[in-house]
Amino acid sequence: MALRPAAGAALGLLLGLLALPAAAAPACPPVKPQVRVSISDPEPRLSTAFGIDALHAKSGRPRSANVHHLALTSSRVEWEGEIDARTATGRGGVCARPERVMLTLTQTEHLIRIAREIPRGSCLFREVEAHERRHVAVNRRTLRAAAARAREAATAWAATAEGRGVTEREAVAALQRGLRHAIERTVGAMRAQRDAAHRGIDTEAEYRRLSRVCSADQRALREKLRAVSAD
C-alpha cells in the first residue's frame, strides 16, 4: 500500500510532462522578393596552339584515316547565386525568406581552336572559322535564353521559399539549397538545348560541304599530313 502514492505521484509527473506544449515553429517574415539576373559573356578567344591530332583527342571522337578534325569550339557555363534573407526567430528555431536574389550566369570558357596546320588568313582557315562561329552563336544565344528561364525559375521559387533551421545559418543554408535545385534544372535544360543545336550544325551535309571548299588549301593540307605520317 505504501507504494501506491509514489506510483500515483510518478504518473502525475509523467502526465504533466506530456502536457507541456511543443515549441512552435517560428512564423516566417513577410517579404516581397526581388530577383536580378546578370550575364557575363566575353568574346571567345581564337587559338591555333593545337594540331589536328590534339584536336582529335579533345573531341573524344574515334579516329579515321579519311576524316581530320580541323577545329573545336568549347564553352563552359557557370552560375553564382546570392541571397539576402530576412529571418524570424522563435522557440522552434529560425525561419528565413529571400528578400533579394542575385544570379550571375558566366561563360567562363569560350575558346575556338583551329588546327595549326591550316595557315591563318587562308581560304580554308576562313571557312573553318565561319563554321565554328556558328557554334559560338549557339553558345551565346542559349546562354541568354537560360538567363531568362533562370529569372522565371528564381522568381517562382522565391515567391514561396522558406528555409528553416535551429540557427540562422542553417535556415539560410536551406534557402541556398532550394535555389540551387531550382537553377540547376534550368542550366541542365540549357545544356540539352545547346547540344541539340550543335548537332544541327555538325551534319554530314555540312562536313561534305567543308570537304569541297578551298580545293588548293585542301590539297596542301593533305600533302602536309602525308609528309608528317611518312616521317
Where are these predicted regions, by residue range?
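Internal, charge-rich low-complexity segments
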Residues: 145-163
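Short alpha-helix carrying the canonical HExxH Zn2+-binding catalytic motif
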Residues: 121-134
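Boundary at the C-terminal end of the N-terminal hydrophobic targeting segment
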Residues: 22-27
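Metalloprotease/metallohydrolase-associated module, dominated by Zn2+-dependent proteases
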Residues: 29, 33-104, 114-115, 157-231
